[in-house]
Swiss-Prot record:
Residues 346-534 form the Rab-GAP TBC domain. This is TBC1 domain family member 10B. The lineage of its organism: Eukaryota, Metazoa, Chordata, Craniata, Vertebrata. Its main location: cytoplasm. It comes from Mus musculus (Mouse). GO terms for biological process: regulation of GTPase activity; retrograde transport, endosome to Golgi. The gene is Tbc1d10b.
Length: 798
């Protein structure tokens, strides 16, 4: 064998030059290919022509006219002609050896000229795969990179075959087109080293052709077995994806599946897996960025600015709310103004769900009906409602992480709530405006709690809003239009002139409680005040929006027709929807429950005169949590130790409970300050049961002077506070009247100026016309006589 110069080595990297970046790992391709044991790349130098042999092919023996050498035997090259191949290790190879590899060779891209025969040459692009670390999962690429070197089917043995255990290669001689020229000696597989060294013999034995080329073979690790394989392409943003190799895509796909396949996030999934992957994907495209409210890609209508509260202030508010929860009945009955003030400041996010349940009294409703929601959920619903509900699920906040996925847990819980309500209230059924309301509740609390909160909204806060015919919302539209006449006469006059019915723009506002209109920060603040103060807040918010949209002459100049006005109402100004501005305007607007009830009576009377009786008669509307609390106390009066056992309310309540089959309440627990224990109740035969028994009353005969003085003081303070509140309300009404008067004067002044301007324009047009007629008139008489009387009158007129 001829001896030549030393083996070629890779040129050193320049000082300060960064190493070439490693591309992402690529797994093995389907079909026949060469594989070796996992580990770092191994570079082997051989002096024989190289060809690829697939695993399982019979390794040919040495034929006459060829030279058999060991893959691990280092050889020298006589010229700069080398061959670069990228191979993969065989899983059958022993996994006991680890080989270090230079970092400079990792990820190198080399252009190789392969000579498949002695006469023809083909040039192919070979991309060497980087070496993943231990435990790094590999993935099977979906398509083959252009120009990648692939393993061919087994070929017939040719002269110049090099056989090695675990790595078998064949190839011809080629010129190096680019890349690192490297030749290192390494052992691939378990090839026994030939102690005899290079083989040299007489003609007819295995000899290397001259000049001897150097074939540099880079071996990449093989993929893990299929059992431990995990496909990274199907991994969603919230959890692991579907394990297993990539399967062939089906011939027919749904629209969502096809979109997901095009976006590269969906493979052929089993039938029991959602095509959306996870709840944080929209149409198969994972969106990891969410705002603090859970909206993907930013908050709902993110153009508004959100107010930031210092952390210490937020913690203090949380402690105050927790203290109120511990004595809730006391706070509602005695210090409701403080509760209302704290609701207007904003309920802390961590306690908002609990506060909504306490304010609406849905917590007590849930405790009184244990297992009722599960019973309604198991019942069979009306198919006509269930079909409509299922169609509306994907329309509710599609950019929120709870409802982004088709069939996700958010849509499933929403379906359960709406279905249960149709069974709980079969006379009302389902209204499409209930879905966004239930969705907002689901964002803050579990399904069962959200259901009872929805029941309270539909029964106590907005009765009749979601019934057939929508008569209650039409009646409230008339009430709203009457209140608008007081709050903003200019907007009221414009809407009446354009003949725009209130139902055209306020239906979505009222029925969805502005959940689909305002920025999300403002929506939560409005809902906080709504649960505390009732429907009055909805009227106030709508009046503020209209006053700041159509309440001035400058704003009405762009709303000359009905279309322009409706377009303006669909695109409300951002300033009036901003959280702090909106809350400030709503709290200062002088619209009370008395106004609403007075207008309700007047509009109901007009309705009966023009349209007849209401088809659906809802229950009485309650204005906020205090009214709900007082109604609950009236329906269930507390039995204290001083109450008579034979009093009429007590007998009625006991009789009603006996008829209903409910167990009688336990006797009241005696306290230390309750006084002496009453003796046996003595009832004469002729004593009427409505009269209290003298022996059953354990109330002390008199109270101390200190207690009476404190009670009088408390009553006096309450009266003073009520007077102050009335005075402030009158002052606000006076200021509002002054503002309306000023607006009317401004409007009159502008109308006067407009008339003057039009008058001046008409005068100017008249002068021009007069001069034109003089110039176009007949020429003056040559004899110097006077003009005719008609001509004189014409000039005098103009």
């Amino acid at each position: 064998m001829e001896t030549g110069p030393a083996p070629l080595v890779a040129p050193p990297r320049r000082h300060g030059a960064p190493a070439a970046p490693s591309p992402p790992p690529r797994g093995s391709r389907a079909g026949s290919h060469l594989v070796v044991e996992p580990g770092p790349p191994v570079t082997t130098a051989t002096s024989a022509p190289v060809e690829l042999v697939a695993p399982g092919e019979a390794r040919p023996a040495c034929v006459p006219g060829s030279s058999q050498t060991s893959a691990s035997t280092p050889t020298t090259a006589t010229s700069s002609t080398v061959v670069m191949l990228t191979l993969e290790a065989s899983p059958e190879a022993a996994k006991t050896q680890e080989f270090p590899a230079p970092a400079a060779e990792t990820g190198a891209e080399t252009s190789v000229a392969l000579a498949l025969g002695t006469d023809t040459q083909k040039t192919e692009e070979v991309r060497a795969s980087p070496v993943p670390g231990p435990g790094t999962p590999t993935r099977t690429p979906s398509r083959m990179a252009p120009g990648a070197l692939t393993a061919k089917p087994p070929l017939a043995p040719k002269p110049g075959t090099t056989v090695a255990s675990g790595v078998t290669a064949r190839g011809g001689v080629g010129q190096v087109a680019g890349g690192h020229e490297a030749a290192t000696s390494a052992s691939a597989g378990s090839v026994p080293e030939d102690p005899s060294g290079p083989v040299t013999g007489p003609p007819g034995t295995c000899e290397a052709p001259a000049p001897t080329p150097v074939a540099v073979v880079t071996v990449t690790p093989a993929p893990e077995p299929v059992e431990n394989f995990q496909d990274l392409g199907s991994t969603s943003s919230l959890g692991p994806g579907i394990s297993g190799p990539r399967g062939q895509a089906p011939d027919t796909l749904s629209y969502l599946d096809s979109v997901s396949l095009m976006s590269g996030t969906l493979e052929s999934l089993p039938d029991d897996v959602s095509s959306m992957g996870s709840d944080s994907e929209i149409n198969g495209m994972a969106l990891r960025k969410t705002d603090k409210y859970g909206f993907l890609g930013g908050s709902q209508y993110s153009g508004s600015l959100e107010s930031s509260i210092p952390v210490d202030v937020a913690r203090q508010r949380e402690l105050k709310w927790l203290e109120m929860f511990s004595n809730w009945d006391k706070w509602l009955s005695r210090r409701f103004q403080k509760v209302k003030l704290r609701c207007r400041k904003g309920i802390p996010s961590s306690l908002r769900a609990k506060a909504w349940q306490y304010l609406s009294n849905s917590k007590e409703l849930l405790e009184q009906n244990p297992g009722k929601f599960e019973e309604l959920e198991r019942a069979a619903g009306d198919p006509k409602w269930l079909d409509v509900i299922e169609k509306d699920l994907h329309r509710q906040f599609p950019f929120h992480e709870m409802f982004a996925a088709r069939g996700g847990h958010g849509q499933q819980d929403l379906y359960r709530i709406l279905k249960a309500y149709t069974i709980y209230r079969p006379d009302e059924g389902y209204c499409q405006a209930q879905a966004p309301v239930a969705a907002v509740l689901l964002m803050h609390m579990p399904a069962e709690q959200a259901f009872w909160c929805l029941v309270q909204i539909c029964d106590k806060y907005l009765p009749g809003y979601y019934s057939a015919g929508l008569e209650a919302i039409q009646l409230d539209g008339e009430i709203f239009f009457a209140l608008l006449r007081r709050v903003s006469p200019l907007a009221h006059r414009h809407l009446r002139r354009q003949r725009i019915d209130p139902v055209l723009y306020m239906t979505e506002w009222f029925m969805c409680i502005f959940a689909r209109t305002l920025p999300w920060a403002s929506v939560l603040r409005v809902w906080d005040m709504f649960f505390c103060e009732g429907v009055k807040i909805i009227f106030r918010v709508a009046l503020v929006l209209l006053r700041h949209t159509l309440g001035s002459v400058e704003k009405l100049r762009s709303c000359q027709g009905m279309y322009e006005t409706m377009e303006q109402l669909r695109n409300l100004p951002q300033q009036c929807m901003q959280e702090d501005f909106l809350v400030h305007e709503v709290t200062n607007l002088p619209v009370t429950e008395a106004w609403i009830e007075r207008e309700n009576a007047a509009q109901l009377k007009k309705w009966r005169e023009t349209r007849g009786e209401l088809q659906y008669r809802p229950s009485r509307r309650l204005h906020g949590s205090r009214a709900i609390h007082e109604e609950r106390r009236r329906q269930q009066p507390p039995l204290g130790p001083s109450s008579s056992l034979l009093s009429l309310p007590s007998l009625k309540s006991r009789g009603s409970r006996a008829v209903g089959g409910a167990p009688s309440p336990p006797p009241p627990v005696r306290r230390a300050s309750a006084g002496p224990v009453p003796g046996a109740v003595v009832i004469a035969e002729g004593l009427h049961p409505s009269l209290p028994s003298p022996t059953g009353n354990s109330t002390p005969l008199g109270t101390s002077k200190e207690i009476r003085r404190q009670e009088k003081e408390r009553q006096k303070q309450e009266k003073d506070r009520e007077k102050e509140r009335q005075r402030q309300e009158k002052e606000r009404e006076r200021q509002e009247k002054e503002r309306q008067k000023w607006e009317k004067e401004q409007e009159k002044e502008q109308q006067k100026q407009e008339k003057e301007r039009q008058k001046l324009e008409k005068k100017g047009q008249g002068r021009k016309l007069s001069l034109r007629r003089r110039a176009d008139g007949p020429p003056a008489s040559h004899d110097g006589g006077d003009r005719s009387a008609a001509e004189a009158r014409q000039d005098a007129y103009f």
